[in-house]
């Protein structure tokens, strides 16, 4: 236990909490421009061609964002919205692209979990 005199000289340091999504700067989403759209292979034991985009954000950060869902219309210079959320089998991918916002179209013919993929309600 520190004495009063010790605390007067050197106060207690507040705990610093580390964020998993530093590029968002405590915002729920950020806008950015795709600088490169490509596919990458996941870590073992998984096998696929995961779609990702390198994005230059409005705050100057350059991050890698995962593009979820089947098919996408993104290319270089597309303006997209990203949110936090890592992809466990892709090292260095800590952000997700929000489907159905800005230049990123929603997933076609999506029936379930539509809100997560920007898909409109199908005509019954």
Swiss-Prot record:
GO terms for molecular function: rRNA binding; structural constituent of ribosome; tRNA binding. GO terms for cellular component: small ribosomal subunit. Keywords: Methylation, Ribonucleoprotein, Ribosomal protein, RNA-binding, rRNA-binding, tRNA-binding. InterPro entries: NA-bd_OB-fold, Ribosomal_uS12, Ribosomal_uS12_bac. Gene3D superfamilies: Nucleic acid-binding proteins (2.40.50.140). The modification 3-methylthioaspartic acid is found at residue 89. The keyword rRNA-binding applies. GO terms for biological process: translation. It holds the Pfam family Ribosom_S12_S23. SUPFAM superfamilies: Nucleic acid-binding proteins (SSF50249). NCBIfam families: rpsL_bact (TIGR00981). PANTHER family: 30S RIBOSOMAL PROTEIN S12 FAMILY MEMBER. With S4 and S5 plays an important role in translational accuracy. Interacts with and stabilizes bases of the 16S rRNA that are involved in tRNA selection in the A site and with the mRNA backbone. Located at the interface of the 30S and 50S subunits, it traverses the body of the 30S subunit contacting proteins on the other side and probably holding the rRNA structure together. The combined cluster of proteins S8, S12 and S17 appears to hold together the shoulder and platform of the 30S subunit. Belongs to the universal ribosomal protein uS12 family. Part of the 30S ribosomal subunit. Contacts proteins S8 and S17. May interact with IF1 in the 30S initiation complex. This is Small ribosomal subunit protein uS12. It comes from Shewanella amazonensis (strain ATCC BAA-1098 / SB2B). The gene is rpsL.
């Amino acid at each position: 236990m520190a004495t009063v005199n010790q605390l007067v000289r050197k106060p207690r340091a507040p705990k610093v909490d580390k964020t998993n999504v530093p590029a968002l700067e405590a915002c729920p989403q950020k806008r950015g421009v795709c600088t490169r759209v490509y596919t990458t292979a996941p870590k073992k034991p998984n096998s696929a061609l995961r779609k990702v985009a390198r994005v230059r954000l409005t705050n100057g950060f350059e991050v890698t964002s995962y593009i979820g869902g089947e098919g996408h219309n993104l290319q270089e210079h597309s303006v997209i919205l990203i949110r936090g959320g890592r992809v466990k089998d892709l090292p260095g991918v800590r952000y997700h692209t929000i489907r159905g916002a800005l230049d990123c179209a929603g997933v076609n013919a999506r029936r379930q979990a539509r809100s997560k993929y920007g898909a409109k309600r199908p005509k019954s």
